[in-house]
Design a protein with these regions (language model features):
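Glycan-recognition and catalytic cores of secretory/periplasmic carbohydrate-active enzymes
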Residues: 1-174
């Protein structure tokens, strides 16, 4: 399993997409980038692990570049949460709050938990990810419902009143 994964990751690193970061399902090139927050669970831990296994700095360099591009677009510094993707940057919930998906932010926290297990302790970028993990964890903790769950909408629990078990699972895992 390692060799096909490594071969694909090497191809991606050697042929980085110059597609836009704004998600548009009609444009294939936007799916080549980490244009939705869920991708921060799917890809970065793999690139960190490949760096650890091979020592090839291209993997961690690529991961840092793509992660920060996603962070720059989707992380709201005021709310300290990630938008699901660029389509949500201007949308609001019924209560007027910005839309931040519980599951999406859970994906990010889960990805950070996985990455930080292997991320080199002396790497200059480690502090960015540690700080982000703490920031996002503290914010998520404040948004937990009294019943112990999180909701699909982190700032408008009434919009989806049922508990969001996948968000809760990811956040608790992290």
């Amino acid at each position: 399993m390692l060799y096909p994964t490594q071969a694909r990751a090497e191809w991606v690193v050697n042929h980085p997409s110059d597609g836009p970061m704004e998600l548009d399902y009609k444009k294939r090139e936007t799916l080549e980038r980490w244009t939705w927050c869920d991708a921060l669970y799917m890809a970065p831990p793999v690139y960190v692990k490949l760096y650890v296994l091979t020592g090839d700095k291209r993997f961690i360099k690529f991961m840092n570049k793509e992660y920060k591009a996603t962070y720059d677009l989707l992380f709201d510094k005021d709310e300290r949460l990630f938008y699901r993707d660029s389509r949500y940057l201007t949308q609001k919930e019924a209560n007027g709050a910005k839309i931040f998906w519980g599951r999406g932010n859970g994906w990010v926290l889960g990805g950070l938990a996985e990455m930080l297990q292997d991320f080199p302790k002396k790497d200059k970028n480690r502090k960015f990810y540690e700080d982000l993990f703490v920031t996002l964890s503290e914010r998520a903790a404040k948004l937990q419902s009294p019943d112990g769950f999180w909701h699909a909408s982190m700032l408008d629990p009434a919009s989806y009143p049922s508990p969001e078990t996948s968000a809760t699972g990811f956040i608790v895992y992290a």
